[in-house]
Amino acid sequence: MCIRDRAINSTANVLRPSLQIIKTAPGVKTVSAFFLMMVPNCEYGENGVFVFGDCGLCQNPTSEELCVIAKSSADSFKGFTGKEPRVAFLSHSTKGSASHPDVDKVLKALELTKEQYPELIVDGEFQLDAAIVPEVAKTKAPDSEVAGTANVLIYPDLDAGNIGYKLVQRFAKADAYGPITQGLAKPVNDLSRGCTAKD
């Protein structure tokens, strides 16, 4: 197991040698990162436990890359919790409520994920509340098996993911473990320079 600490180093300085030395896992084309989020006193997700992907590495992933991120994040959730992942692709739109190329990217990622990984419980596109709040899901996405129950949240880009995890960490006082790199042949952990001793 390889753990790289960037409490004083940039992500690039940590991941460049990781990619050069460790390489990607067999069959994986996209290396990404996730956060294991543990939100206190929260009934959403898996009793407050979520995986957020990608919040630390892929700046503006394509639909194809989002598909791989979804699969890797689902596997990471299962590996850490032992629970069944329920994957939601996040967007500013829920089930066609808005039209935009950014929404199209997420819809294409969902289509690819369902084709390539039919065993995954996955759906989208969802606004956050539709993904995790059952009462909202009943109104916005009543026919979805994921809406209102998602425990793996796939962000459309790094801006949304990074802002999202930090909002939950700071406002909800959640424990945020990561970014943990996924898709490499060996585990790599890349700590934020804003990390605490507890992290």
Q: Where are the predicted features?
A:
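Conserved small/polar residues in nucleotide/adenosyl-binding loops
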Residues: 1-3
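Anion-binding alpha/beta catalytic cores of soluble intermediary-metabolism enzymes, centered on
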Residues: 5-147, 151-199
